[in-house]
A protein has these predicted regions:
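Short, small-residue-biased leader/transition segments that mark boundaries at the very start
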Residues: 1-3
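Short beta-strand/loop segments at the ligand-binding rim of alpha/beta enzyme cores
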Residues: 6-18, 83-94
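Glycine- and other small-residue-rich loops at beta-strand/loop junctions that grip anionic moieties
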Residues: 17, 68-72, 93-97, 118-121
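Short, catalytically relevant binding-site loops at active-site mouths
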Residues: 18-22, 46-49
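Catalytic cores of alpha/beta
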Residues: 20-34, 85-87, 98-115
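Glycine/Thr-rich beta-alpha phosphate-binding loop at enzyme active sites
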Residues: 31-90, 128
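Glycine-rich phosphate-binding active-site loops on the catalytic face of alpha/beta enzymes
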Residues: 39-47, 97-98, 104-131
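Extended, intrinsically disordered, low-complexity segments
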Residues: 73, 130, 134-142
Length: 142
């Protein structure tokens, strides 16, 4: 938090793993409330391979590393919703599995203040951002 001590204009957000359990998320929320963290980014990539259609052999061939994209969506929504149920004020950037406009709306409805896309851009291209913005503007969130 050295940068926060030097310059209070730089927002600091903590990115958390979708692999955390609810007790661990509670611990993170306790720490965030005392350490001048401005918000949370929920979630990072996952190390689990649950719910994939690939065979065990294919998964072993792919190797280790963080999994992102659509397989992360449901857990990311759960984490965002859980955080919002525990803290109504903390800013949350919802990340994970946002591959189409409805996914962004779902993330906002779960309690995120902002959404971040990355894998969705790879599969849908940069027009995804425009589509998300249009969907939000025409939704009940606006």
């Amino acid at each position: 938090m050295c940068i926060r001590d030097r310059d209070h204009t730089v927002p600091v957000f903590l990115k958390i793993s979708p692999n955390l359990g609810y007790e661990q998320i509670d611990d993170v929320l306790d720490i965030v409330s005392t350490q001048k963290v401005d918000g949370l980014i929920a979630t990072n990539t996952t190390i689990t391979r649950d719910g994939l259609s690939a065979t065990d052999h294919q998964i072993k061939q792919i190797g280790n590393g963080g999994l992102s994209g659509l397989p992360l969506k449901d857990r990311a929504l759960e984490v965002v919703s859980y955080i919002r149920s525990k803290d109504q004020k903390i800013p949350i950037i919802g990340v994970g599995g946002i591959c189409e406009p409805q996914h962004a709306i779902d993330m906002l409805q779960a309690g995120a203040n902002l959404v971040q896309v990355y894998s969705g851009l790879i599969y849908s291209g940069p027009s995804l951002v425009k589509k998300i913005n249009k969907a939000i503007l025409s939704s009940s969130l606006n």
